[in-house]
Curated annotation (Swiss-Prot):
Designated name of the protein: Tyrosine-protein phosphatase non-receptor type substrate 1
Cellular compartments annotated: Membrane
Keywords: Disulfide bond, Glycoprotein, Immunoglobulin domain, Membrane, Phosphoprotein, Repeat, SH3-binding, Signal, Transmembrane, Transmembrane helix
SS bonds (residue pairs): 55-122, 172-229, 274-332
Membrane topology (UniProt): Single-pass type I membrane protein
GO terms, biological process: actin filament organization; cell migration; cell motility; cell-matrix adhesion; cellular response to hydrogen peroxide; cellular response to interleukin-1; cellular response to interleukin-12; cellular response to type II interferon
Keyword Zinc: no
Domain Ig-like C1-type: 150-248, 255-349
Amino acid sequence: MEPAGPAPGRLGPLLFCLLLSASCFCAGASGKELKVTQADKSVSVAAGDSATLNCTVSSLTPVGPIKWFKGEGQNRSPIYSFIGGEHFPRITNVSDATKRNNMDFSICISNVTPEDAGTYYCVKFQKGIVEPDTEIKSGGGTTLYVLAKPSSPEVSGPDSRGSPGQTVNFTCKSYGFSPRNITLKWLKDGKELSHLETTISSKSNVSYNISSTVSVKLSPEDIHSRVICEVAHVTLEGRPLNGTANFSNIIRVSPTLKITQQPLTPASQVNLTCQVQKFYPKALQLNWLENGNLSRTDKPEHFTDNRDGTYNYTSLFLVNSSAHREDVVFTCQVEHDSQPAITENHTVRAFAHSSSGGSMETIPDNNAYYNWNVFIGVGVACALLVVLLMAALYLLRIKQKKAKGSTSSTRLHEPEKNAREITQIQDTNDINDITYADLNLPKEKKPAPRVPEPNNHTEYASIETGKLPRPEDTLTYADLDMVHLNRAQPTPKPEPSFSEYASVQVQRK
């Protein structure tokens, strides 16, 4: 009797167990021999280029697919599979699929972006009959570095302007560079700054950003200054990128005020000048106040440039002094760059008004300027006094010359006083026999000696009287209207006489 065979219903499970045991044995035996090799530990490419990731296996058994993953562990993500039917944009198989027993499973990533940076793994799977494929071997991984250039540095300053003496911060930022290594430094007018803080951040270790802040103390000379943020990276090939910021955009220099005046004009007007000096920027409004009341507003458009970058502005204000009978305070008020107004005062003091009109005296706030005006006034007064004195002396001298040239005096001298000069006396008892008249003619400058001329003459005067004088008369006056001058040829003399006499002969009855 032949033994009975296995029941038909039990044959299926038995075959399945045998096949499973054989598969496990074959997998164990071949697992010891299978090798997955990724020859390149790292690959670096520039953004936009293509990157090739190599992978080879030592055996095609056990049967199962090969897949590529980015990352490892639970966070890894599949990027490519050699099983047909799946589509992966930008990734292609670079192996020769027509080659028999092809063991090359390399891939190529085109148009690489910084987000593609990371570590990639080539993994061998064993195909499962019932269960999913099982990972049996992985390569060592290839790190992809995307060489991304940093963006141009962006430099920003404070939101509002600062004054000299204040400390302000500048910030420099650059984005999207890879790898992480980067160098950043600050320069001011060619000199490197040291007070800075720099941080580097990344987004999933794909690309990096850098931010740096530097502190600078402002000075009045910084209007023409600027700061430079310099970034150096391997992708720049020795040509660093620069970002700049000008101090002229963040500095404010407040003006100084000075009021001066010119002397009072004949039209009773005073010219006041407000000098606004060394300010920056140009944003300026000037107001003239009269005793606190707005009188005029200037919004200048033309300025005087200084070498240090600041500006000057001068405003003129004409004051009609005759319209004021009391002291007036004029104020120069300046509003600069939306800052609180600064002021400078100037007092104009009224003089006592006369019937012909009034006048005013300007009293500057500056004592030195006032003293200078006093010195000028004293000097002018002294000069006028000297001129008046010289004019008076000149007029007096002219008057004396006219008096000498237009008048002459004739006087009769008593004979007793001139007795020694009389050559002949007719009667000693009559004192009125002969009377001499002294003609004091104006003396002229003594002329230079010259040769006597034959026409030199002597002048005589004869006086006729109608009656005899009384004995008691001692003086006889001669009316010049009765004097007749006769010319006669005199004997030449070596030198002319300076006194002329007229002999008068009185006839007796």
